[in-house]
Amino acid sequence: MKVRASVKEMCDKCRVIRRNGRVMVICTNPKHKQRQG
């Protein structure tokens, strides 16, 4: 899980979602998991 100020999709499998008011990226590749913070 990467914590970043700006979250971006890194591949075509990445999806930007909102969870509990947080912007997150979920992906089949665990290296691409990100959270805004």
From Swiss-Prot:
- The primary site where this protein sits is plastid
Q: Which GO terms describe its molecular function?
A: structural constituent of ribosome
Of the GO CC terms on this record, one is:
ribosome
Q: Name where it's found.
A: Plastid, Organellar chromatophore
Task: Output the superkingdom of the source species.
Answer: Eukaryota
Q: What biological processes does GO assign it?
A: translation
- Mind telling me which SUPFAM superfamilies this protein's record contains? Ribosomal protein L36
UniProt keyword list: Organellar chromatophore, Plastid, Ribonucleoprotein, Ribosomal protein
Q: Which Pfam families match?
A: Ribosomal_L36
- Residues in a coiled coil are none
- List, alphabetically, the HAMAP family matched: Ribosomal_bL36 (MF_00251)
* Family the entry assigns: Belongs to the bacterial ribosomal protein bL36 family.
* Protein name per Swiss-Prot or TrEMBL: Large ribosomal subunit protein bL36c
Its source organism is: Paulinella chromatophora
